[in-house]
């Protein structure tokens, strides 16, 4: 039933878009699409790289970074972590790849997107830069964020950026099965919150019921 509802929901923008589309009147973004802003107040650009930083300071702060997962047999670093404080190393740069990229280079709230670590790597490790949600971890009681995802595919790699109820933004994981038919949706019934759990003394990004991670975005110069 939920899948049927989601399909109906996703068809609405298709009807709206197709009714106004001609070769002389190209598809435009929904009128209520709100650009995601970085800490400088500039709109995020899919061609640029950003660090995902905390909206808090001190022990409550810390950038997001790529690191080695405990007990992982992956040939490359594949864990997504957050530093234990904002005093220390900078996070690993990322870029955001929107599912509606044919509308332009902007990144918008509630838009389905992929997240990729923007780093130089070997050919072997290229696929270990794209975010996804891994299998259920029984010891932690949740699913952990890791790399090894796929850009533009309906698997475990779709996320959203939404405005936080407190400060900055939240990240959501949205396991939809029909991606391009519904690039924008403010209905988060089908999305799960991204937060932090503690794994071997580190803060690991994971799916949570409460206390989602509040983040901001800082452009890498």
Curated annotation (Swiss-Prot):
The record marks 143-144 as: Reactive bond for chymotrypsin. SUPFAM superfamilies: STI-like. A motif (Vacuolar targeting signal) lies at residues 25-30. It is found in: Vacuole. Disulfide bonds join 76-125, 174-191. Induction: Not induced by sucrose, methyl jasmonate or wounding. GO terms for molecular function: serine-type endopeptidase inhibitor activity. Residues 23-28 form a propeptide. Residues 1-22 form the signal peptide. The keyword DNA-binding does not apply. The record marks 95-96 as: Reactive bond for trypsin. Its main location: other. GO terms for cellular component: vacuole. Keywords: Allergen, Disulfide bond, Protease inhibitor, Serine protease inhibitor, Signal, Vacuole. Tubers. Not detected in root, stem, leaves or flower bud. Belongs to the protease inhibitor I3 (leguminous Kunitz-type inhibitor) family. Inhibitor of trypsin (serine protease). May protect the plant by inhibiting proteases of invading organisms. Has a single chain structure. This is Serine protease inhibitor 7.
């Amino acid at each position: 039933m939920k899948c049927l509802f989601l399909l109906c929901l996703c068809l609405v923008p298709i009807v709206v878009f197709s009714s106004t589309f001609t070769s002389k009147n190209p598809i435009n973004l929904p009128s209520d699409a709100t650009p995601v802003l970085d800490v400088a107040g500039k709109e995020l650009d899919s061609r640029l790289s950003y660090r995902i930083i905390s909206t808090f300071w001190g022990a409550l702060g810390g950038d997001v970074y790529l690191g080695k997962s405990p007990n992982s047999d992956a040939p490359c670093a594949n864990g997504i972590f957050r530093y234990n404080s904002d005093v220390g190393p900078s996070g690993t740069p990322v870029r955001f790849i929107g599912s509606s990229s044919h509308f332009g280079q902007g990144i918008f709230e509630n838009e389905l997107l992929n997240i990729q670590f923007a780093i130089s790597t070997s050919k072997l490790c290229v696929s270990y830069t794209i975010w996804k949600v891994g299998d259920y971890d029984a010891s932690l009681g949740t699913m952990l964020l890791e790399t090894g995802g796929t850009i533009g595919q309906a698997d475990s790699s779709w996320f959203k950026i939404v405005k936080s109820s407190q400060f900055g933004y939240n990240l959501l994981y949205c396991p939809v099965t029909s991606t391009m038919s519904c690039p924008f949706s403010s209905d988060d019934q089908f999305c799960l919150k991204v937060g932090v759990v503690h794994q071997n003394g580190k803060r690991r990004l994971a799916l949570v019921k409460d206390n989602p991670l509040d983040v901001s975005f800082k452009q890498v110069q």
